[in-house]
Amino acid sequence: MRVGLDLDGSLESLGNSMTDLADALEAAGGCTLVRFRTRSRAGAGDAALASRMWWSPWWRRGLGRSIDRLLPPVDVVHVAGVSTPPTRDVPEIVSVDDLRALREESRTSQRAAQLRRVIARGAVVVASSQVARDEVLANLGVARDRVVVVPPAVPNLDLTMDGDALVVNVTGAVEHFIRLAPSLIDAGARLEARVIALTSTAAAQRIRSGGIDVDLMARRDARRALGQARVVVHVSDGARFPSFAIAALAAGVPTVARSTPINRELLNGASELAESDGDIIEQVKDLWSNEPRRALARAAGWARAADFAPSSAATAYLNLYGDVVRGWGS
């Protein structure tokens, strides 16, 4: 089975999840991989796309030249991110890892129309969780069998055993973080811990303008932030897969998050899920100093993180590729 995989679809701060998937697919040996890039110049070993710069804006709308006409022979094409180029003679799989474009009213029609267009051509959309799948189905109004669930690859990271910071991952929930920050800062002072907020550039500006006294780190520094963490707090709007929280579990860092539908699906039993902001603070304090509880949290985290390792994602995608290829044209 020959698989064309777009390496430009990753949205993760810990690394390129599509490259991690590609490496795991090749290690598994279940397919012949053709790597390509829809939004950037081809790297060593990638298939070059003729007139890519011309077609790229069209592909963002699900239009333009069929991608399989620009690639070496493949049996299925897998893309992610914002580019959804059409295919002519082979099936297409589209991973949707960010739901914000479907939530934001000003952009909903464009993103929804793009996804409906590729589904109408026979594409299968991949959501990262059951909760995300339900949201995609509700927004697009398509048949349930057109949207499946495969979690993205979360990279394997070194263990963090001597971190001394309270690291807060803020993903699309900056106002929630600003409300929570004074309590986090107070807890950090009592624990003699730095409070680090890992955020986007826009969120960092909002936090600075609010006079919040925390150390700010950019998403590109996610690995460095995790290497300093003793406890991680995951603050998110639920639009993205909680890769940083899962990476923290893999690194042996106890993690706290609010008890939301997506967190209950993916993190329950491995992270501490709090019903309120006050509960978050109490969980942080206990996980900081309670060594027996930290040991239990690390063991549970390692077990859960294994479900999302690149090798697990590769196995799931190989099964999906086979199903889609067999069902093409039937």
Region annotations inferred by a language model:
Residues 1-330:
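Carbohydrate transferase catalytic cores enriched for Leloir-type hexosyltransferases
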